[in-house]
Amino acid sequence: MKAPSPLPSPPKPVVDFNPFDELNIDPESPGPRSTVPLPFARPTLPEYYDGDMDLTVEIDRGDVWYEFPYDDLGQERAQPVERRPHTTIFTTYEGQRIPLARFGTTIGGWRSEFIEGQVWWKYKGSPHGPVVWTEIVAAPVWLPPETTPPRDLLDRNPLRRNAGEKPFVVDVHETGPSYASAYGLVAAYHHTYRETNDGALRIYGDEGIRSHGSVDYMSIMRRHSHGCHRLHNHIAVRLMSFVLAHRHHRREGMQRVNFSRDMEHEGETYRLEVNEGGYVFALERPIRVEVLEGRIRGSVGAPITFPIPKYDEVRGGYVLPDGGAVLVRGSELVPTTLATPDGGALDDTLPSDGAVPSLDGGVPMPVDDAGPWGTTR
């Protein structure tokens, strides 16, 4: 590497120094920008630093709770976390795996879902295991699934007091492209894969999981996502820009999207339309990502797959659409009875076979055909 140029001599002290005088700039009319050399010697870059680095990513899920986070009275249970999830980017050089940077991130948890006209609790997990990043998407868009509550996609209409105006408008910032969208400024898409006998990677479908930016900064250190691995927006831009600077890629341009959804809320219908996606940078060599299982906490060792009704403050319990009530016991729902205002009890029981009605069947989420925009956030 070429040796740095000798540092320029520092300027002589000036009494009553005025920076505008020294640079011959009129503070009232500065005119075109001026440049001034500064005495700075850039540190020598490490040997492994080049234009096409052998990069890998590891996402540690940290402490993971699968248990339902509310008790029989609808009060939040304590689920302490000592190890927060984090993302680490590595490079491998001469057989040594070198960590380059580590950032806080999120994993999935219990979130609200709109199922059969009712808002439920549903565990939205972050699957562990190997995946790959095949593309980086700038200014991505989020296509909300039918399970997204309509109110989450609406904003108060500032003109709602005017005649003929609806009380809400579609929140276009939530879908994007926008710094405040569900996917933030940039996203990397997670794909499952299989390695063939000759070492090639066979890339499979998009599971809807992303590593992406987010404007909800406090969620990254304290709360859960819908399954995606959120990063602070500025961190996501730094990370993905580094990947593109050190991984050969090609520009595929803007995604074409034809997405629409009609939403009913408080007797009004609102139409959401998305006609264009983000700008795609396709990586010539996918980046391998290992999502670690983390440390499972509590008594439930696997994700609860069925939805759980929201706590009904009036009835005083978790009430199913058919009027039956249930309690959450570990990874199961058990029937219970709720007292009536007159002190009696309602016959709130599950079906005779004791089964919990399947509520996911009507809202299947695509896996192999999810496309590059996915369903989670």
Name every feature range the model reports, one short phrase each.
Residues 1-377:
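N-terminal pre-domains immediately preceding structured catalytic cores
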